[in-house]
Amino acid sequence: MNVIDTDDLEKHTPMMRQYLTMKAEHHDMLLFYRMGDFYELFYDDAKRASELLGISLTARGKSGGDPIPMAGLPYHAVEGYLAKLVQIGQSVAICEQIGDPATSKGPVERKVVRIVTPGTLTDEALLQERQDNLLAAVYQGKIGFGYATLDVSSGRFVIAELDTRESLEAELQRTNPVEILYSEDFGELGLLNGFKGKRRRPEWEFDYDTSIKLLLAQFGTKDLHGFGIADARLSLQAAGCLMQYVKDTQRTALPHINAITRFNQTDSIVLDAATRRNLELTQNLAGGRDNTLAAVLDNTATPMGSRMLQRWIHQPLRDPKHIKARQQAVTELLDTAAHEGLHEQLKALGDIERIMARLALRTARPRDFARLRQALGLLPELQQSLSTLSAPHTTQLRQHLGEFPAEQALLERAIVDNPPMLIRDGGVIREGYNSELDEWRGLSEGASDYLVQLEAREKERTGINTLKVGYNRVHGYYIEVSRLQSSQVPLNYQRRQTLKNMERYITPELKEYEEKVLSSQGKALALEKQLWEQLFDLILPKLHELQAFARAAAELDVLSNFAERAETLGYTCPELSQDIGVQIEAGRHPVVERVSQTPFIANPVTLHNQRRMLIVTGPNMGGKSTYMRQVALITLMAHIGCFVPADCALIGPIDRIFTRIGASDDLASGRSTFMVEMTETANILHNATASSLVLMDEIGRGTSTYDGLSLAWSAAEYLAQQVGAMTLFATHYFELTQLPELMAGVYNVHLDAIEHDDTIAFMHAVQEGAASKSYGLQVAALAGVPNKVIKAAKHKLQQLESRDHQAEGTRTPIQSLLALPEPVENPALTKLSSINPDNLTPKQALDLLYELKRLS
């Protein structure tokens, strides 16, 4: 029951009419409907929640003549259930009781007060603390795409204008949003496969004029020129949809979203989706985080530092000035050992970035304020530690940290040392902060002394030794007497409750005191909540400066982390060159060296203008893929300002890194392994430049031997002669080792192995020249292929090698395929291919026949 016919509402009970009306307004999400101490779900929502959460599916009587499927969950456990739902991309509308059941006529007044979606989370319990939580929107124009991302938990708002489908795919891979909004006519839904929280939105939400008005209102500006985005039409339409969606779900002001930036691909090294996946930067091929570059590099002290590090990894810089600024900061931290003390100081700051977002949304909890107080109190010490450092970038970050003595003093006066989780029951505001609150609390807290005195006095007056004075939330204050002595109670005792062995009474005096105490408790709680709300008003004027403090602290954390990683893992500072090239001495794979059970064999690489392509040969399991990946990872690490696992490295300017390593079927798109391989190869051949780093592994293996060899040869030749990209080209086609004889700038290197009897030892050391053999049969034996099959394979190999040897003298020398003449096109066929016969008149068709005759 998803679509509600309002004409049928009269058939239902008043409560179900209220529910169905609210459900109609939130038909595309689960509705948690508060009833007492439970959230209830009905109809299809109940069935879906039962399936997703493993809760019992029951029925609640009948309404409209039919049994009502129902599922419920306790309100105090709701956060755990919400976490499960948002993790699988499900959105939830939370409907609370806002009326008083005691005074309500008919159903208690209820209202949807909160909408929880995967991309709009700010609650600490629902977020992955070391991952950005991005909401994205994509809009397709006649040419290109507009893409926007917003992290509601930090306020970071970024847009990008993307020319091609491949660029959009790369951005989706880079940002990895948890929720994606797309327009009704979006034509590339295949790109969204694998993303959980997909939301189809009406076209009007992407309207350009509406989007501009929304953004101007949000930022409080007359135009968008100051952000440098005024001409980004498509991405502004996507940003407008995001803004509308966040306003609809958050239902409050969003002051922490106060700026928008444009992501320019020219500012960072371009990494396409295949490259990010193949290099396992922040996610391994199985979808986890283990054994990734981020897992090795991330020893940050704060969650916000960890998130920034991952953004840096996915956006390696191209500007050498910015890279060197980071390097200088890391070098100074390392040389002075300042990173050691900084790590502990930064760790105590916590996740200020997300705390500030919750404060801006007025959803911060008492412990958020306590953590902010602690962080602000640590600032003077942090500033003092940084005062001895002189690297320009560190000095700039120190200035952005700021100082907030007034705000720290305010929170010190206002919030108790160890506040409760929620403001709901009070106990958050410190004694002495407000005299009126202290007075009301005094009345309430004096109750225990009064009750002790009353109990002693009544025992003495009545002579009843079992008499006790107590309190519970349901019945309030009472005098309790055993049933055996209940006949001795005075006449002014009024029976309040009968238990199995006890009677409970109230007296006029106790009733009067109860009303006074409960009144004081209520007034104290109401005043405390009022003072709590005022704290937001007192802190929010410093929101922008506090956000700048959080960003600066996060960056200091990353730089300090780089220094610690360099010291711990033996990394060195790479040198940046203005000349194109990658030269690494004794380079190591940053991930493999950490997980390998044996000592890692370091290897060099030399690529420059006169040595642009290396044909890499060697046995399977010999380390070719590891070698190529380590070159790419070291290059990337150098461009984020990190030190690298090598004795030394000289890295020139890079515009793109491409990888064609490994492949599997793309079942969702109906593409075979070979089709995936060729698609990635085509992307490289179309987009690589002389400043690109290209890794090509086993091109052509998914088809016949001669087809594969021809494709591999042509691709290598094209990259070497037409593109001139710095290329590592691994292959088992030994014919390709002849390329260095035919063209300049191409060299052979190989990884060797030593064979002894029927065993093989991989050396993992890169040497100049081509490999002598592939050792395929030996590797097959290591894999456990039966001996009978191995022996048969050896016999067949001898036959094939003998046949090849006999044919050796008749072979035509291999020549450059690109040097062959272009095939001559038939003019008649060219003319015919350009004709649409449906558009021809009889006379035009006859004339065309004569022309084709002439051309042929």
UniProtKB/Swiss-Prot annotation:
ATP binds at residues 618-625. GO terms for molecular function: ATP binding; ATP-dependent DNA damage sensor activity; damaged DNA binding; mismatched DNA binding. One of its GO terms (cellular component) is cytosol. Pfam families: MutS_I, MutS_II, MutS_III, MutS_IV, MutS_V. Disulfide bonds: none annotated. InterPro entries: DNA_mismatch_repair_MutS (IPR005748), DNA_mismatch_repair_MutS-lik_N (IPR007695), DNA_mismatch_repair_MutS/MSH (IPR017261), DNA_mismatch_repair_MutS_C (IPR000432), DNA_mismatch_repair_MutS_clamp (IPR007861), DNA_mismatch_repair_MutS_core (IPR007696), DNA_mismatch_repair_MutS_N (IPR016151), DNA_mismatch_repair_MutS_sf (IPR036187). One of its GO terms (biological process) is mismatch repair. CDD domains: ABC_MutS1. This protein is involved in the repair of mismatches in DNA. It is possible that it carries out the mismatch recognition step. This protein has a weak ATPase activity. Belongs to the DNA mismatch repair MutS family. This is DNA mismatch repair protein MutS. The lineage of its organism: Bacteria, Pseudomonadati, Pseudomonadota, Gammaproteobacteria, Alteromonadales.
